[in-house]
Amino acid sequence: MTPEEIAALPYRPCVGVVLMNGDGFVFVGQRMDQNTDAWQMPQGGVDEDEDPFEAALRELWEETGVTADLVEMVAETDGWLPYDLPHDLVPRIWKGRYRGQEQKWYLFRFLGRDDQIDLETGHPEFSRWKWQDPDRLVAEIVPFKRDVYERVVAAFAPHLG
């Protein structure tokens, strides 16, 4: 695909979840489908006619096993935060239909225990997880998502740590 063709593609609507524990650390999972040391927070597409908040709760459950009764919403981003995929990935991800994603992010306080996080879900996305200091989070994220993660951490900074 040419850069012009990629620029004409839409963004995929997506939600992201910052899951914060009582110590102010955030959940990150190591992706199963990457050969690199790629970490990220739970995120995923918004289904057609799905409310973004409900999509965030669904993605959190699908990726971590954490149910809605174990979280409390603290904040959400004002708008949608876009990022572009590297051009070489566009034809391979989402069958070349999107140039990247635009994400609505939610900050949830985790009310449960660590043993209630279960990566062995129907479609596992993470091989392992950890609680990470928000100040050190961005450095572990794949480079093309770092700008969005910086904006998310900045947006939620008053509530983190």
Curated annotation (Swiss-Prot):
Residues 10-154 form the Nudix hydrolase domain. HAMAP family: Nudix_RppH. It is an enzyme of class 3 (hydrolase). The keyword Hydrolase applies. Pfam families: NUDIX (PF00293). A motif (Nudix box) lies at residues 44-65. Belongs to the Nudix hydrolase family. RppH subfamily. GO terms for biological process: nucleoside phosphate metabolic process; ribose phosphate metabolic process. Keywords: Hydrolase. PROSITE patterns: NUDIX, NUDIX_BOX. It comes from Ruegeria pomeroyi (strain ATCC 700808 / DSM 15171 / DSS-3). Its EC number is 3.6.1.-. Accelerates the degradation of transcripts by removing pyrophosphate from the 5'-end of triphosphorylated RNA, leading to a more labile monophosphorylated state that can stimulate subsequent ribonuclease cleavage. GO terms for molecular function: bis(5'-adenosyl)-pentaphosphatase activity; guanosine-3',5'-bis(diphosphate) 3'-diphosphatase activity. NCBIfam families: PRK00714.1-4 (NF001937), PRK00714.1-5 (NF001938). This is RNA pyrophosphohydrolase. Its cofactor is a divalent metal cation. InterPro entries: Nudix_hydrolase, NUDIX_hydrolase-like_dom_sf, NUDIX_hydrolase_CS, NUDIX_hydrolase_dom, RppH. The gene is rppH.
